[in-house]
């Protein structure tokens, strides 16, 4: 059996169209029809019924479809394993990470991890906190790194760092106080999951004329502050890096604002040796860096 026949069958089943399957696979429509005839002959069953310009799966076709997908998956997984072996990798870890962690923590942590574990292939995808939890639960990621407590019974998880927040503003030579910063700039909000509406309500109660603008992501807030468009409460870890380059600066914050802590959580589903090594190194790194 030719795997190309299976790929064509799956494409036609999902699109319900030989024409669309041909476009998706860069084949001619007659080639798609030929693949289906050969597959039906091989299996001794009819897979499709024609309905106008569309095709629909027969009962046999519906039964066979998940097995066709599994055969393609096994083939691709085996091919990937051989490719990893040729590149010198013997194991792999997939990370689902919060945007803040991807931008500000992993670039400083991963070089040390890779140097110590050169045979582990790493892949990452960036997602929101809820999507990170779902990715680990559904085995789409081995490790999740989030700024939100997953609060679940289905995963292992650990709070690996509690950092601090501070008020950040565009850099200037003389250091202003919080009142002058919040008078001069709009406060960029909802860029970090460590605080919520209660914290913002407390700020409003002390600075009733303060203007706010929701931006959604830490990176967005940092870039907007560098452009002089606002101030924000961000992890001290970020501000230390930006202040050294004279791009942003930390501003002393009055105690009555009661700054929340900046949290980082790691979650995982299976207790493999590779995951435990990753956890131990990341925990030590976060404690040293006080992220």
Curated annotation (Swiss-Prot):
CDD domains: PBP2_LTTR_substrate. Pfam families: HTH_1 (PF00126), LysR_substrate (PF03466). Residues 1-58 form the HTH lysR-type domain. The lineage of its organism: Bacteria, Bacillati, Bacillota, Bacilli, Bacillales. GO terms for molecular function: DNA-binding transcription factor activity; transcription cis-regulatory region binding. The gene is yxjO. Residues 18-37 bind DNA. GO terms for biological process: regulation of DNA-templated transcription. Belongs to the LysR transcriptional regulatory family. This is Uncharacterized HTH-type transcriptional regulator YxjO. Keywords: DNA-binding, Transcription, Transcription regulation. It comes from Bacillus subtilis (strain 168). PANTHER family: HTH-TYPE TRANSCRIPTIONAL REGULATOR (PTHR30126), HTH-TYPE TRANSCRIPTIONAL REGULATOR CITR (PTHR30126:SF64). InterPro entries: LysR_subst-bd, Tscrpt_reg_HTH_LysR, WH-like_DNA-bd_sf, WH_DNA-bd_sf.
């Amino acid at each position: 059996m030719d795997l190309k026949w299976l790929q064509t069958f799956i494409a036609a089943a999902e699109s319900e169209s030989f024409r669309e399957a041909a476009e998706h696979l860069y084949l001619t429509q007659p080639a798609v029809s030929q693949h289906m005839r050969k597959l039906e002959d091989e299996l001794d069953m009819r897979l499709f019924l024609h309905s106008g310009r569309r095709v629909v799966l027969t009962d046999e076709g519906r039964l066979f479809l998940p097995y066709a997908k599994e055969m393609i998956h096994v083939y691709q997984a085996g091919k990937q394993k051989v490719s990893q072996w040729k590149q010198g990798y013997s194991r792999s870890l997939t990370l689902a990470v919060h945007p803040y962690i991807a931008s500000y923590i992993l670039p400083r942590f991963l070089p040390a991890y890779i140097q110590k574990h050169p045979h582990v292939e790493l892949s990452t995808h960036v997602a929101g906190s809820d999507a990170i939890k779902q990715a680990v639960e559904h085995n789409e990621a081995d490790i999740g790194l989030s700024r939100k407590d997953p609060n679940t019974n289905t995963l292992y998880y650990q709070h690996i760092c509690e950092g601090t927040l501070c008020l950040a503003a565009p850099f200037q030579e003389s250091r202003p106080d919080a009142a002058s910063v919040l008078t001069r700039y709009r406060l960029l909000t909802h860029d970090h999951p460590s605080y919520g509406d209660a914290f913002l309500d407390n700020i409003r109660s002390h600075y009733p004329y303060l203007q706010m603008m929701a931006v959604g992501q830490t990176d967005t807030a940092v870039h907007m502050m560098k452009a002089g468009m606002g101030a924000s409460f961000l992890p001290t870890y970020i501000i230390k890096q930006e202040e050294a380059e004279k791009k942003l600066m930390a501003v002393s914050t009055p105690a009555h604002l009661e700054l929340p802590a900046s949290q980082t959580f790691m979650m995982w589903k299976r207790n493999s040796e590779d995951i435990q090594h990753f956890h131990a190194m990341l925990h030590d790194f976060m404690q040293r860096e006080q992220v």
